[in-house]
Every structure is written in C-alpha cells, then in structure tokens.
Regions:
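Flexible, glycine-rich active-site loops centered on histidine and acidic residues
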Residues: 1, 61-124, 164
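Active-site mouth loops of central-metabolism enzymes
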Residues: 1-3, 58-66, 138-148, 256-265
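N-terminal beta1-alpha1-beta2 module of alpha/beta enzyme domains
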Residues: 1-51
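Short, acidic/polar
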Residues: 1-12, 149-155, 267-274
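Conserved, mostly hydrophobic/aromatic
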Residues: 13, 17, 25, 44, ...
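Hydrophobic faces of well-ordered beta-strands that scaffold small-molecule active sites
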Residues: 21-23, 53-55, 83-87, 144-147, ...
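An alpha-helical appendage that flanks or caps ligand/catalytic pockets
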Residues: 105-133, 174-279, 308-315
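A conserved active-site cap/scaffold subdomain adjacent to cofactor or substrate pockets
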Residues: 152-173, 179
Length: 316
C-alpha cells in the first residue's frame, strides 16, 4: 500500500535522524499518490514524533492562498514546530489537468509572488484586524520555502528573503546559475537572516555499485515514460535498460539525471563530496525512485551513514 509504505519510510527517516520529510503535489499521475498533499502531510505527521513534515511543494497557483493558509495553519496547530510549507508555481501535472484544476496560465508570473505575500500576511499576528483571516493559521510560525528549477525562482527567493529548494533531481541545467543569483542578491528577512539552499537530488544507494546500478533502472524507466508521455506506475528494474531506451532517450534522460548519486557507500561518498565542494549547499534532499521498499529503506540508511562520515550539513 502506497500510503503505508510512505509512512514506513518517514518513520525510518525519523529513526535515522533525517531533518524533514516532504511530499509533492502532483495530479493525474499513476506513479504518484500525493495529489491531496495537505492531507498526506497530516497522515505522516500523525504517524511520526519529531521529524519535520512538509510540502515539496504546494503548487500555489492551483489554490487559493487563504485555503492553503488555513490548511497549514491547522497542520501547525496539530503538530506545532514540525510543519514546512514549500511552494512552487508549476502545475504539477499536464495542461489538460491544469485546466481542470481551474488554473489560469495568463498571470502566474505576477500572481505567484503575490500569493506568497498573501500567505505571509495570513500567518502574521498583525492580520487580526483584517476583514479576511486564516483561522487556524494566524500567528503560526510556518517557514515558507520557495521551490524552483530556474533563475526566476532564484531571484524571487532572494528578493523575499526565503529559503530556496532547487529541483536538481529532474531539471539541473540552471542549478549553478540559480545558486549564484540567489546568494548574490539575497535580502535578509527577520525569519531568515541568511540565505539557505536545499539541493534536491536523486539518490540510490546499495551495498555495491552493481546493485545500486540495477536498482536505478526504475528511475530511468520513470523518466523514459515522461519523455514518451506514457504515465505508468513505477516499474521494477530490468536486466538490460539499453533494451528499453533508444540512444536519443538515453542521452536525454542522463542529462536530466546528471545530479543523481547512484552507487555503493564509497561511490556515494565521493560523488556527494564533489558536489558539495562545488555547490556548498546547506542541505541535501534525497529522493529515491526505488521499486522495492526494503531496498529503498536501506538506501536512505546508507545515505545517512555516508553523510555522518562526511560531517555534511542536514539531509532530508
């Protein structure tokens, strides 16, 4: 069961002292069951004790800012000090489904920053005199993170003085430029006086490089399906991935996944250190497209052990 496995994964992450566990908003995707993101955050938070739980992220233009403020205000009231609100502007789905969600593509670039300001206003204690209030939500200390994969999101996060989570796990092209823009133009805020970067990357670890490579075929098949616009559930790993993709698909997938850490403990350690030496991020966020649940749990354990050996910053 997908939800039960997700809770098991979150409990395992908590046991391993991962900092946070985030869930993404996606719609009309057979391989992802987190369309009701706020509901699942409550489910995971209720089944764990201390790990932070949040959205990675809420696709804000799909929603009313007030509704999101109320939902996350409720979550924060139920699980104080444990809720994160990551927000993005992408639809999290295909164009037809985006229309079904009531999304208006004409004014998103202007409306998204305004929606973030609305959230901040609804969460502010000073909003108590307003005609429209988020109850619960008002006065809640809920950190807002801006998600993105472009320089636009980097500029916005810097201007608003908010932490920045970059989607390097599927759109790495602008990562270096986005980080430079964010750091160079950061405007300190009361809640976040310093810039804070989370690098979202793919991670598949196993006892050996060979085993990890075999597990990674599920990840590759998932991205092949994206290229082919073939929305299927995740597939078990195959013996020969070259029999599945053609040369053009292979090149495209490997380009999208070039910040993927796949291997045994020694290989993972080397790759993580090279990445950190270059980007110097504040936090790693690991996503693992692994078909077998036990192998997935083991992968996160290996990453935790490697990060501890390296004395790196937070891992989520």
């Amino acid at each position: 069961d997908t939800f039960t496995d997700s809770l098991s994964l979150a409990r395992n992450a908590e046991k391993l002292n991962y900092k946070r566990f985030w869930l993404a908003e996606h719609h009309n995707m057979a391989s992802i069951a987190s369309s009701a993101t706020s509901v699942l955050i409550g489910y995971i938070a209720n089944g764990t004790d201390k790990i932070r739980v949040g959205s990675g992220g809420i696709m804000l233009p799909n929603h009313s800012s007030l509704v999101i403020a109320e939902q996350f205000g409720t979550l924060e009231s139920l699980f104080p000090g444990r809720i994160d609100l990551g927000v993005g502007r992408a639809p999290g789905t295909d164009g037809i489904t985006a229309k079904a969600l009531g999304r208006n593509p004409m004014n998103i670039n202007q409306h998204f920053p305004h929606q973030i300001q609305e959230l901040q206003q609804y969460f502010s204690p000073e909003n108590s005199k307003s005609a429209v209030r988020a109850i619960p939500g008002e006065g809640c200390d809920i950190p807002i993170y801006i998600l993105g994969s472009s320089t636009d999101s980097a500029w916005l996060a810097a201007k608003m003085g908010l932490p920045y989570a970059f989607a390097g796990h599927f759109a790495p092209d602008m990562m270096a430029t986005a980080f430079e823009i964010y750091r160079s133009n950061y405007e300190p805020s009361a809640q976040f006086p310093e810039p804070y970067i989370i690098a979202c990357v793919n991670g598949i670890a196993a006892e050996t490089d060979e085993k990890a490579k075999q597990l990674s075929n599920t990840l590759y098949q998932a991205f092949i399906n994206i290229i082919r616009d073939d929305r299927q559930p995740f597939s078990p790993p195959v013996d020969d991935i070259d029999a599945v993709w053609n040369p053009m698909e292979k090149a495209h997938v490997l380009k999208m996944l070039r910040y993927s850490f796949i291997g045994g403990p020694s290989t993972i350690k080397t790759k993580l250190q090279e990445f950190q030496d270059y980007f110097n991020v504040d936090e790693f966020m690991i996503t693992a497209h692994i078909f077998d649940q036990e192998a997935k749990l083991k992968s996160y354990e290996i990453f935790r052990n490697v990060v501890d050996e390296m004395n790196l910053n937070a891992i989520t």
